[in-house]
UniProtKB/Swiss-Prot annotation:
Protein name listed in UniProt: Shikimate kinase
Function: Catalyzes the specific phosphorylation of the 3-hydroxyl group of shikimic acid using ATP as a cosubstrate.
Enzyme Commission (EC) number: 2.7.1.71
Cofactor: Mg(2+)
GO annotation, biological process: amino acid biosynthetic process; aromatic amino acid family biosynthetic process; chorismate biosynthetic process
Cofactor note: Binds 1 Mg(2+) ion per subunit.
Disulphide bridges, residue numbers: none
Organism: Streptococcus gordonii (strain Challis / ATCC 35105 / BCRC 15272 / CH1 / DL1 / V288)
Length: 161
């Protein structure tokens, strides 16, 4: 049985995942290792559709192998097939955070500049964020409001589920 950490980029999925299990499965890291380049470079060379296919195959493999903690990218919910896979999982934990907090986190994370952030204005980015919110909420079996909580507090809440 997998615990899947859902949420928009910058919500803290990777940070919390590492606290829950040092051997957790960060899907973006797995994909980068598989494709041999950064996700930004892959997006630029191959496009989002090619990335989403690899993302789906990675999710299917992790679920089939019953990975304990999985942290997918925030766009995992874009693909209807991924949503179907996620809806069958008993522990989908949505790390919910408001847009302004999230945007500041992403803006300040100079080491991890993401294509969705780089290629959109703040207003366009907010529309994408708002479009995904109801999908995260529908798929989630548990919702944790993470603003104002430390990663350690969030991890402890998840351990108690």
């Amino acid at each position: 049985m997998s615990k899947i950490l859902l949420g928009f980029m910058g919500a803290g999925k990777t940070t919390v995942g590492r606290l829950l299990d040092p051997n957790f499965h960060d899907m973006d890291e797995l994909i980068v290792n598989q494709i041999g380049m950064s996700i930004n470079d892959f997006f630029a060379q191959e496009g989002e559709e090619a990335f989403r296919k690899i993302e789906t195959a990675t999710l299917e493999s992790l679920l089939a192998n019953q990975a304990k903690i999985i942290s997918p990218g925030g766009g995992i919910v874009v693909n209807p097939h991924n949503r179907d896979l996620l809806e069958k999982n008993p522990y989908n934990i949505y790390l919910r955070v408001d847009f302004d907090t999230l945007y500041k986190r992403i803006e300040n994370d100079l080491a991890m500049q993401r294509p969705l952030y780089l290629n959109n204005t703040r207003e366009e980015f907010k529309k994408i964020f708002e479009a995904r919110l109801p999908i995260y909420e529908k798929i989630a079996t548990h919702i944790i409001d993470v603003a104002g909580k430390t990663p350690e507090e969030i991890a402890e809440i998840i351990r108690c589920l």
